From Swiss-Prot:
<comment type="pathway">
    <text>Cell wall biogenesis; peptidoglycan biosynthesis.</text>
</comment>
<comment type="function">
    <text>Cell wall formation.</text>
</comment>
<keyword id="KW-0521">NADP</keyword>
<comment type="similarity">
    <text>Belongs to the MurB family.</text>
</comment>
<keyword id="KW-0133">Cell shape</keyword>
<dbReference type="InterPro" id="IPR036318">
    <property type="entry name" value="FAD-bd_PCMH-like_sf"/>
</dbReference>
<feature type="domain" description="FAD-binding PCMH-type">
    <location>
        <begin position="27"/>
        <end position="225"/>
    </location>
</feature>
<keyword id="KW-0560">Oxidoreductase</keyword>
<dbReference type="GO" id="GO:0005829">
    <property type="term" value="C:cytosol"/>
</dbReference>
<protein>
    <recommendedName>
        <fullName>UDP-N-acetylenolpyruvoylglucosamine reductase</fullName>
        <ecNumber>1.3.1.98</ecNumber>
    </recommendedName>
</protein>
<dbReference type="InterPro" id="IPR011601">
    <property type="entry name" value="MurB_C"/>
</dbReference>
<keyword id="KW-0131">Cell cycle</keyword>
<dbReference type="GO" id="GO:0008762">
    <property type="term" value="F:UDP-N-acetylmuramate dehydrogenase activity"/>
</dbReference>
<keyword id="KW-0963">Cytoplasm</keyword>
<dbReference type="GO" id="GO:0051301">
    <property type="term" value="P:cell division"/>
</dbReference>
<keyword id="KW-0132">Cell division</keyword>
<dbReference type="InterPro" id="IPR016166">
    <property type="entry name" value="FAD-bd_PCMH"/>
</dbReference>
Amino acid sequence: MDKENFTRLRGELFCDHPLARYTSWRVGGKAERFYRPADLFDLQDFLTQLPSDEPLTWLGLGSNVLIRDGGIKGTVILTLNRLKELSVVNSQLVFREKSGTEDFFSGNGKTIIRAEAGVTCAKLAKFCVSQGLEDGAFFAGIPGTVGGALAMNAGAFGGETWRTVIGVETMNHQGEILKRTPDEFKIHYRQVEGLENQFFIAGYFCFNHGDPDKAKTAINALLKKRNLSQPIGKYSCGSVFRNPPGDYAARLIESAGLKGKSIGNAEVSEKHANFILNKGNASAADIEALIHYVAQHVSQIHGIQLVKEVNIIGRS
């Protein structure tokens, strides 16, 4: 299935397309098909023309995913810098209709921002700062896009994505857009249930008004803290494991003596033990083997089973 099988497309469609450069680990095989939509409406056109049983995988910044060396079956859709609309919206608007009645959500005097899935969390944080919204600064510590943050309830510096969400837009396999509210989902620590073969394409975030200078100071302080504690600029996915209740994955890994542990060219970071680095030419298999080794070793030493935060996908 190539571009000749489609009409009206304005995006870019590739077959057998290498995926490593689209992930922050810089590893992984090829996608059978890879689509980079021009915008949200082009994505709708594309999806309406796909077979109903076509497997779909969505990528943003590729920062919380390990793509295996055998690649991905079906179609990979890249949202980064394609679903990129970011704006302040009316503080009270019609969000959806139910049984002929209009449901409203309101910011109660706060600021509501609509951000599409391909907007990076760093860009969302900077936009919040420009609007004087200090409580949105934590997004600067999330190394991904809005779509990924919504899908996993990403968080940083004590903030969590879904604490700020008052509504979302999702898209199904047929390209239909649905508007949904948080009460339709089960929100957990680094996990969201209730998507059911749909994909997040935009979020509505509600923030308190504040002083732009204070917001800028807050984001700078958070970024300084991150740069001191994390291996910024290295090939990693961010945190590999979720923090267990009452503890930290990094502390458990470090106390198990695993800092600097390597398999192939994958290595547990010396700076932050919950980061695994690609030292230059690691394979996805190297990284996955090290993830399993760390989890097994921590379980043996501490009796705690670490749960992966990173999503491992594709064929071995």
